[in-house]
Swiss-Prot record:
Entry annotated with the keyword Ion transport: no
Ligand binding (substrate): 23-27, 72, 146, 201, 312
Catalysed reactions, as listed in the record: uroporphyrinogen III + 4 H(+) = coproporphyrinogen III + 4 CO2
Superkingdom as given in the UniProt entry: Bacteria
Protein family according to the UniProt entry: Belongs to the uroporphyrinogen decarboxylase family.
Gene3D superfamilies: 3.20.20.210
GO CC terms, sorted: cytosol
Protein name listed in UniProt: Uroporphyrinogen decarboxylase
Subunit structure: Homodimer.
Organism encoding this protein: Thermodesulfovibrio yellowstonii (strain ATCC 51303 / DSM 11347 / YP87)
Site feature location: Transition state stabilizer: 72
Gene Ontology biological-process annotations: heme biosynthetic process; protoporphyrinogen IX biosynthetic process
PANTHER family per UniProt: METHYLTETRAHYDROFOLATE:HOMOCYSTEINE METHYLTRANSFERASE RELATED, UROPORPHYRINOGEN DECARBOXYLASE
Length: 338
């Protein structure tokens, strides 16, 4: 198995910079689109053989240094008694919603048997991959936002109303999701994943004070329960939370493009970093793309180690050939001698 990604997770510099992409298994790939014509999204997630096939596609086509399991961050909710649905042009929908302390009774304990297909897919993949497999889950907070809002939103009014009107109830919800996510990710680890990534996609909607109060303690607790494999913590739009992020004890911090990676390197000394190219750079010219890729690579040179990635998922309009070129560029990039 290729080791560059796992070495970088542990803070070891390798001969080349390892690279993989969030949402690398997805809608921009013709192979994925063919399967999607036959099956709806949830069926693909819930059929281990299909989930494994989709996970393998970008490894074979792009030559990336790690695979990430094809699934969705909302999958565990069905195993807690909620209903999830994916509607074209609307995104994920979650019912019923939890918006008060009284609503917490809706939520059941995570039943791993109901999502056994996730672990079956992992067991298939570890026998077929020649690169490490990354498992993943939403952070307790990001999971909570979907359950409270019922889907995607811009203002998170219901989330913040619950948080500020009934803080004790919100803390209870966070505790429930922390326990469930610990259980879910540890089962992925038992099934064979080599690393896990926690997606805190919506952490950036909070002030530093509220992140410290309502999110940080639960993320720390979650990370500390997962230390048998490297843990990557991804958050979006969180440059203003950087001082809190460095205290999380994640093995790797994955950052988006809204912070210069050189600045992040200076602020997060002795911390492996992942990121942080703007995904939409891939829609531009090769010249503009590689100019920015080089800036990321050089900017991250001072980090303990670096895993090249995007600052968010691959956009649906991205060219497969452009991603291939990007992988080759990163692998072949030579730094000037220090």
């Amino acid at each position: 198995m290729k080791e560059a990604f796992l070495k970088a997770c542990r803070g070891i510099r390798t001969d080349y910079t390892p690279v993989w992409f969030m949402r690398q298994a997805g809608r921009y790939m013709p192979e994925y689109q063919k399967l999607r014509q036959k099956y709806d999204f949830l069926t693909m997630c819930k059929t281990p053989e299909i989930a494994a096939e989709v996970t393998l596609q970008p490894v074979k086509v792009l030559g990336v240094d790690a695979a990430i399991l094809f699934s969705d961050i909302l999958i565990p909710l069905e195993a807690m008694g909620l209903k999830i649905e994916f509607i074209d042009d609307k995104g994920p929908q979650v019912l019923p919603n939890i918006r008060t302390v009284a609503d917490l009774e809706i939520l059941g304990e995570l039943n791993l048997e109901k999502i056994g297909f996730v672990f079956d897919a992992i067991r298939i993949l570890i026998n077929e991959l020649n690169v490490p497999l990354i498992g993943f889950a939403a952070s307790p907070f990001t999971l909570a936002t979907y359950v409270i809002e019922g889907g995607s939103t811009k203002e998170f009014v219901n989330t913040k109303r619950f948080m500020f009107l009934e803080p004790e109830g919100f803390h209870k919800l966070m505790s429930l999701f922390t326990k469930a996510t610990q259980k879910y990710l540890n089962e992925q680890i038992r099934a064979g994943v080599h690393a896990v990534q926690i997606f805190d996609t919506w952490a950036g909607i909070l002030s530093p004070f509220d992140y410290e109060s309502f999110v940080k303690p639960y993320v720390k607790r979650l990370i500390e329960s997962l230390k048998t494999v490297p843990v990557i913590y991804f958050s979006s739009n969180t440059a203003g939370l950087i001082n809190h992020l460095k205290e999380l004890n994640a093995d790797v911090l994955s950052i988006d493009w809204r912070i210069d990676i050189k600045d992040a390197t200076d602020l997060l000394k002795n911390k492996p970093l992942q990121g942080n190219l703007d995904p939409l750079t891939l829609l531009g010219s090769d010249e503009e793309l590689f100019k920015r890729v080089e800036k990321v690579l050089i900017g991250a040179r001072g980090a303990k180690s670096h895993i090249f990635n995007l600052g968010h998922g691959v956009n649906i309009n991205t060219s497969v050939d452009k991603l291939k070129k990007l992988v080759d560029f990163v692998h072949e990039f030579k730094f000037m001698e220090d």
